Amino acid sequence: MMDTAIATIRAREILDSRGRPTVEAEVELECGIVGLAQVPSGASTGSFEAHELRDGDPKRYGGKGVLSAVENIETRILSALVDLNALDQTVIDQCLLELDGSENKSNLGANAILAVSLATAKAAAEYLGQPLYRYLGGPLANVLPVPMMNVINGGAHAANNIDFQEFMIMPIGAPSFREGLRWGAEVFAALSKVLADKGLLTGVGDEGGFAPNLDSNQAALDILLQAIETAGYRPGTDVALALDVAANEFYEDGKYVFDNTSRTASELIRYYDQLVSTYPIISIEDGLQEEDWDNWALLTETLGSRIQLVGDDLFVTNPKRLQRGIDNGVANAILIKLNQIGSLTETLQTIDLATRKGYRAVISHRSGETEDTTIADLAVATRAGQIKTGSLCRSERVAKYNRLLRIEAELGDQAVYAPKVGLGPR
């Protein structure tokens, strides 16, 4: 039996950062090497995401348990993968997809499939004595992403009255990832003081950003500019702004309802145009509802040459939906969430399609995270140039930043910060 053959697979139900169950898997090779992976879970989920298998037993975790996914791993998946070569990631993932047999991974569960897919890759990398980013990305994996730091949370990520889900800062002017992280942390500290001085709450939301009650979405942008300047940086030059609007969450009967106002898609696009003209916003994610394709094309026509327009719920890391966007001139970037599509191979294929067609890829966490740092390695492996992994607090967020610091140090003089080579937001 070859050393890289899969000998056994173990799985368990663990907790994510919201205290909800999620799946952890260990893939052990014949040589004794073990790869371990944990999968995240989202709060604002797109309708077309791969299916996350939950038990539905109200007596356990309010029906959110994942023992059925764990059982699938330790029975059906183990039987199918035992003795296969862990170095053949494409074969492993194809076997998992065929075993599931559904369009959205609802039989085995995307959470079960992804946990095993990632754990296999980690075991293979460990066997070869390579860090995960090098195993996945080869010798050209040397670009450190610019972080999109979610410092004010709203929408489905916080119990406050702000409609837009994420207000982010991006240290685009920094000379390195390490310095960019420092700049972001200093702005975050300044933001805490600005909020406190205004008598606003400094409690944090799911992703570690502050979650104050504010009069409007624009009030959040004004406070961010103040925090950037208080920290000693220049808005737009050193530190830019980005939004995740998550428009699905306030789309009602064909209208977009926020700030106590109902808007048509055309009115909302004009509103975005005004925001971009007023504030140093360089990226807007999910600016319209996930099936509002015609108006997405209008939004792209209006703003696509000036800023990055990211599809998250719109594309759900799915190459078929991305191809539809490409064919119809919709958006110019895609958010990449491993658990939206449910396997490593499909994720890499989607990133490759985006890159070939001139779309930027933004590697992303979920609001329900774990200490798993795979997305940090994935960002470097794919030269994506951007990563979303929350704010500058909560250890499940900071773990990814710290992993990127270690990768940058490991790369030494070979490390390149994405904005320096034109791989940040357009």
Curated annotation (Swiss-Prot):
Organism: Thermosynechococcus vestitus (strain NIES-2133 / IAM M-273 / BP-1)
A cellular component annotation (GO) from this entry: phosphopyruvate hydratase complex
Binding site for Mg(2+): D244, E285, D312
Name the record gives this protein: Enolase
Reported cofactor(s): Mg(2+)
Catalytic activity, as annotated: (2R)-2-phosphoglycerate = phosphoenolpyruvate + H2O
Pathway(s) served: Carbohydrate degradation; glycolysis; pyruvate from D-glyceraldehyde 3-phosphate: step 4/5
Keywords on record: Cytoplasm, Glycolysis, Lyase, Magnesium, Metal-binding, Secreted
Chief location bin: cytoplasm
Binding site for (2R)-2-phosphoglycerate: Q165, K337, R366, S367, K388
Family: Belongs to the enolase family.
EC number: 4.2.1.11
Function: Catalyzes the reversible conversion of 2-phosphoglycerate (2-PG) into phosphoenolpyruvate (PEP). It is essential for the degradation of carbohydrates via glycolysis.
Keyword Metal-binding: yes
